[in-house]
Amino acid sequence: MGRKDHTSLRWGYSTGACAAALAVACWQSLRTGTPPAVVPVLFGDGKERLLPMRPPAPGRMAEMVKDGGDDPDCTHGAVLFARLSACAPDDARPEDHRLDAGAAVLILRAVEGIGRCTRQGLDCPPGKWAVTGGPRRLLVENLARAGMTDGCWLLELGVENGAELARHTLNPRLGVEGGISILGSTGLVRPYSHAAYVETVRLCVRARQRSGGREMVFCTGGRTQAGARRQLPHWPESAFVCIGDFIADSLGIAARHRMQEVVVACMAGKLCKYAAGFANTHAHQVEQDMALLRRQVQACLPGETALHEALHHSASVREALLSIPEAGRQPVLHG
């Protein structure tokens, strides 16, 4: 999309914005008989942007490739497609969404690669296609702008290889089966977004709460998550969530959702940063507090003067821990 933030990373657009663009492209194609090359979409920030289409394959009225900008989401480059046709209100199936667009009625149906919600705690009811509230609003607003003012219409959306893409998302753990979700409150994708990461944690905790769970395991990465699962083999999959560097945000979310027990699985360097009270533990945000670690070692192992001196030459928490006899590490880490 061309927009860049202060880190010079390129913004993109969400699957929800793609759905709105495809719907408008289908509407224009019905009106003119020609698939448009670009489609104007009004985003949640109140700005209009032009999204490119590509020639649709047979059986499709509109088709496009999702551009996620410099965000690492697995849906970047995914092919989305749609069809639009007149229908009757009672053509809606139980899993379809029925949307009111002024005097018009839009029945929203997934035909390939979009999941179906099976649990509480998500932004669409159980049993419905996984198209959340933001995209549903974008759809009706943009179709109204394009001239859809009456009648009943069936919009069929699909994502090529969506079921495979979903394996690389949280959908299987959140109870979304069969494909990806159509997401995006504003339609914009901020690259490597702090807000997006924290929102993912919030969704996982909320889903856990609404399924009756009262405990979470916050893991800072893949290795710590694997280690935590070995230590807690009887805890359910839905209890384990990767939080990256956002310890303070994640603990706040757990408190607001009344979690009764939270286990934090992390490497020693991040543990030291937690002890120092840092809200964000990324290496670019804050350095390891070696002085704090030395004070902890002196308090837990007061007679080890040679060790105290050696720690002054340690460049990292990991290196320092290797200097501590194995029997003394547990008191230092848990003291």
Model-assigned labels for residue ranges:
Residues 1-168, 172-174:
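Generic N-terminal targeting/processing segments that precede catalytic cores or assembly contacts
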